[in-house]
């Protein structure tokens, strides 16, 4: 979700082909995944995260994302993106001529270690290198923060930590800045507090927000974000 500079415009991005499918026990073939994405495009969606370039041993549901990309029709006016977690993922995106990547750093030490095997400070260094590679190859980039509103493992996450990470990312990334409620911990007041703090640094019109409905607050959180 992103609110445009025109306050009457809200952009929605479909992430189901990545965030949805990676949690499913059934592993779909690249052909089926590509067909799903094409059907989503046919609904009128203009922003779709088609998958991720990650270790297939860790996330087998995302194996073959390169083939998914090759199978797609690449409709004009649609922004196709992939999530990348390391430099190898960026290099795959470059090799496959994917025009847009998303790079995220967790604000939670525990989540960062479990997700990437790195402490936040080290993950941030890696992320800035990844963004630099993408930008130098003229790719679009969304740089962002996972667990920006709280963490399943650690509970609340200091907003100062989120702002610190965003400050480092936006210094090298000229594009959108993402704030992800990765484990569905956010409440509307959390949404407002974090967006206001980060927005004062980078501008609210650059922010995107990724939400979950884990505790039945997804719509309330969305409305809180749109109102800002």
Locations of regions flagged by a protein language model:
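Glycine-rich, positively charged N-terminal anion/phosphate-binding segment
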Residues: 2, 30-78, 84-92, 97-100
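N-terminal small/glycine-rich loop or linker at the start of catalytic domains
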Residues: 2-25, 102-115, 136-153, 198, ...
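Active-site mouth loops of central-metabolism enzymes
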Residues: 12-34, 78-87, 113-120, 147-161, ...
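Conserved, mostly hydrophobic/aromatic
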Residues: 20, 40, 93, 101, ...
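Alpha-helix-loop-beta-strand connector modules within alpha/beta enzyme cores
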Residues: 58-82, 121-143, 164-169, 191-209
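Conserved anion-binding
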Residues: 107-182
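Catalytic alpha/beta core domains of metabolic enzymes, predominantly
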Residues: 182-228
